[in-house]
């Protein structure tokens, strides 16, 4: 038998003659393949095979300069893909700031892109240059399995990231409490398992299901994708449907972020105006935690801390939110409450914050001693946020109790700043109360007396400044949270945009090929498929452009500054340890 091949082709360069006939069996293949009937003319006039195809030409019909150009370009892209995704993985390992739930999904995406850069790109380049598959059927099926599983895993990871961002924005209280690294690992595992189950068994064992292998020798493509209708269906399920879902989710994320931005701007604009009006309530409280049921659990525990000119009594009270309030929190988690209790609850619901009990939480009442005065502001019974009355023009008077034993006030501004920083995170309650102790001869009883003493204008201004500082801290925390969400949304938008740009041309050609099997030149097929690979090259660039932490860590790794960073961190910890030990006796006073 004599084997004659009437095809001499160079897929990437259309100026070289090609007699490939594009039949329905070639639809949607990564490389324009030759149908078995049109590629091979079997002649029985000779006892041996003769061939005029490129099987004996290692360059596949290309010129030497074409081979150099193809090898250099594709090799460079593969190298950039490998280095970029290795940087992502190593950066995640060495920088603890990157070990967030959202970045676990990016780590999974980087692993899929790394597989494509190491295996898929190089084998496909060899296939293009040689213009035939010379590694055998088993290697062909393994390559296709790895290629399609990794590519589909990239799509699934993008889908998971989109849903994660969507629920984080729209359900910050309910979803973030469940958003842990363990659940992220489960979602990542499902993405890979689903991708493997969908593609690997069908690619590896389809020839055994149908009883024969229809892929001709020297070619490599998925056997069950020989029909355009099947190829069309897989394109819809693997690309168009996920892209549609991700686009809708991103649009919802964008609208919700814009809504949050307007709400925060309104909160900041009305904050200064409403502060003077609501600072003193007719009942003595501008805001209250009336929506929560305060429940005293036994004896109150109080402790005293001293920071500079501020003296604090932290009185622990346990409280449980009412059933009605819990329902409101779960049903309308999008709204931003203006009270401090709701703000603290919203912040505690984040997975990045400190874990708090599901039912019982702690409220700390702060007792403030104004510098240079012998009075102390103490917490009282009402659970108000800033229950303060001062002798201003528009304000009332403030009831305070005189302390019999005057406390020494330290006027260190640094310690005062630390004082403000410590209680700015808590629902602050400024009220008037002090206890004066009268010790009897037997030291058996302690009496507490109260007296009304108006504050001076200077002291009232200072107290009001503390309340304004607290409100600004709450607004700042909301603003920082919004900025963080915007950065995550920007990263998602960049990744999604790169995915759509790189994957759309090939999938459009798949749709066109369903109705016109000879309208797409082989060069376009190969370029379109390679463009899908380039998406794995672009993703690390998106991380660096949209995330400053990734960018600085990449720079540190490329410049080999890991050891310097570790030494600086150790030196900083040693300095902090010395400072801490020096301050221990002072804090113990």
Swiss-Prot record:
**Coiled-coil intervals:** none
Q: What GO cellular component is one of the record's annotations?
A: postsynaptic membrane
For bias kind Low complexity, which ranges apply? 333-344
Where in or outside the cell it occurs: the entry states: Cell membrane; Postsynaptic cell membrane; Basolateral cell membrane; Endoplasmic reticulum membrane
Provide the primary localization. Answer: membrane
Please report any disulfide bonds recorded for this protein chain, giving both cysteine positions.
140-220, 516-519
Membrane topology field: Multi-pass membrane protein
- Please list the residue ranges that the record places on the Extracellular side of the membrane: 1-66, 130-141, 206-228, 514-525
Locate the motif Basolateral sorting signal: 274-280
Which PROSITE patterns does this one have? G_PROTEIN_RECEP_F1_1 (PS00237), G_PROTEIN_RECEP_F1_2 (PS50262)
Region entry Disordered, spans:
275-295, 323-356
GO annotation (BP), single? positive regulation of smooth muscle contraction
Q: Which superkingdom heads the taxonomic lineage of this protein's source?
A: Eukaryota
Modification Phosphoserine occurs at: 384
Q: How does it assemble?
A: Homodimer; the dimers can form tetramers. Interacts with NALCN. Interacts with TMEM147.
Its annotated function is as follows: The muscarinic acetylcholine receptor mediates various cellular responses, including inhibition of adenylate cyclase, breakdown of phosphoinositides and modulation of potassium channels through the action of G proteins. Primary transducing effect is Pi turnover.
Protein family according to the UniProt entry: Belongs to the G-protein coupled receptor 1 family. Muscarinic acetylcholine receptor subfamily. CHRM3 sub-subfamily.
What this protein is called in its record is Muscarinic acetylcholine receptor M3
Annotated organism of origin = Mus musculus (Mouse)
